[in-house]
């Protein structure tokens, strides 16, 4: 039995670390709860991206591991569906849609994992499966409504569709935080948070285009995916502090 914490090195008391509280559970070295990346409501996008670079240094596998697990499960399901029902058939299309619904809570679990990482809290692969409970219905209804609303706005023109997508961009993080129990309330909260920040977040996303193009070379994606994932989580964190 270990006598010292594998995170900070302090002596364990009754098997738990008095400093880390979670004993030997993994924790990130983030101190973002104390950091501020905005001034008078203006978000410093460069500072957020620099912080993301700092956090993923020596932690690329930390972010990749849960992402690969989700991708692996998704890939296995896709392969099985194709093998059993054929490719492009009505049956395979229906079963694939059902499989995607099944994977929704796991995608929110992945977001929770990343949020725990950037917040300096304990994070674990089990986070991926923490939403397969009564919140399953909330996640499904919210995702369905977001898809419906975005599609309806897109039918008008491309621009309204983009604006709608930006308005809903914080929904996955809000679902991971679990502070709302109603699908429409989650959607309204995302719209409230993004009010006045849609263009800023759009520009923030555009700033990664160069990195995204590098991913066509395959190897850079090893760095780019964690970088973008953590950067977006940090943006949500800062926006949450601003909006309250």
Locations of regions flagged by a protein language model:
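Low-complexity, intrinsically disordered extramembrane tails and loops of integral membrane proteins
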Residues: 1-55, 240-244
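A generic structural signal for ordered secondary structure
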Residues: 8-12, 62-66, 236
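Short glycine/proline-enriched turn or capping motifs at secondary-structure junctions
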Residues: 13-14, 199-200, 224-230
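Juxtamembrane "helix exit" motif at the C-terminal ends of alpha-helical transmembrane segments
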Residues: 74-88, 214-216
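Selective recognition of hydrophobic, aromatic-rich stretches within alpha-helical transmembrane segments
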Residues: 40, 89-123, 150-185, 215-244
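Interfacial aromatic "cap" segments that immediately flank transmembrane helices
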Residues: 43-76, 122-152, 164-214, 244
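Alpha-helical transmembrane segments in eukaryotic/viral proteins
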Residues: 65, 69, 83, 87-94, ...
